[in-house]
């Protein structure tokens, strides 16, 4: 039994890491890292703004795990493309508002860095929302069932 577990572990690891190499996987990983850096900057200057980074980092990590483990196909009652689209759209809007407020206040250096990184996060989340917009995704059409020569 231990041999079968050892043999299946690399296959499972490969299946889980394959998502990390896709465009969506790279975007989610970048969102997690950027939210962590913004969280550190906000914690050093104004802890009141850090809740946005914490929430978005947790949500991005949840979506990363859901897509990485292919749970979105196993939980069909949630519309994952629309959920992901609204998550990224709301994050982009909230990061834009928060960054503008932080940059207008003109605090210490870590606060300014957090504001600039928040604007970068706005662009990243906005691009992710554009990429995941469900209407943009190609729809599959049914293959013709009639023979090429016509019905017989």
From Swiss-Prot:
Subcellular location: Membrane
Alphabetical list of InterPro entries matching this protein: Marvel (IPR008253), MARVEL-CKLF_proteins (IPR050578)
PROSITE patterns: MARVEL
Gene encoding the protein: PLP2
Transmembrane regions: 25-45, 48-68, 85-105, 112-132
Topology relative to the membrane: Multi-pass membrane protein
Keyword Membrane included in the entry's annotation: yes
GO CC terms, sorted: endoplasmic reticulum; endoplasmic reticulum membrane; membrane; plasma membrane
GO molecular function: chemokine binding; monoatomic ion transmembrane transporter activity
Keywords, in A-Z order: Glycoprotein, Membrane, Transmembrane, Transmembrane helix
Glycosylation sites: 18, 108
Domain MARVEL residues, every copy: 19-137
Origin species: Homo sapiens (Human)
Tissue specificity as recorded in UniProt: Enriched in colonic mucosa. The expression of A4 follows a gradient along the crypto-villus axis with the most abundant message occurring in the lower half of the crypt.
Protein name: Proteolipid protein 2
Function: May play a role in cell differentiation in the intestinal epithelium.
GO biological process, one term: chemotaxis
